Amino acid sequence: MSKKSTSAALPSSFEEAMAELEQLVARMEAGELPLEASVAAYKRGSELVKYCAAQLEKVDSQVKVLEGDMLKPFNADRAIEADE
């Protein structure tokens, strides 16, 4: 017997994942889902959050590679002074 995956396919992009996540949150906040559907939506939302976090981490790594030696430690005091 083969194991069925109840999860929907992963989105094709970060933006698609965020859009689906926003829709899930709106439906859950509106209270329009029955209990079983709410649990399924929560599970799907968790998968989407993990996907988005992985995509952001991947892009962050790429940016660090591209910037190489140009990376400098963040100085909060200087950032505040620059805003003033």
Swiss-Prot record:
Its main location: cytoplasm. The keyword Nuclease applies. One of its GO terms (molecular function) is exodeoxyribonuclease VII activity. The keyword Ribonucleoprotein does not apply. Pfam families: Exonuc_VII_S. GO terms for biological process: DNA catabolic process. It is found in: Cytoplasm. Keywords: Cytoplasm, Exonuclease, Hydrolase, Nuclease. It catalyses: Exonucleolytic cleavage in either 5'- to 3'- or 3'- to 5'-direction to yield nucleoside 5'-phosphates. It comes from the Bacteria. One of its GO terms (cellular component) is cytosol. Bidirectionally degrades single-stranded DNA into large acid-insoluble oligonucleotides, which are then degraded further into small acid-soluble oligonucleotides. PANTHER family: EXODEOXYRIBONUCLEASE 7 SMALL SUBUNIT. Belongs to the XseB family. Heterooligomer composed of large and small subunits. NCBIfam families: PRK00977.1-5, xseB. This is Exodeoxyribonuclease 7 small subunit. The gene is xseB.
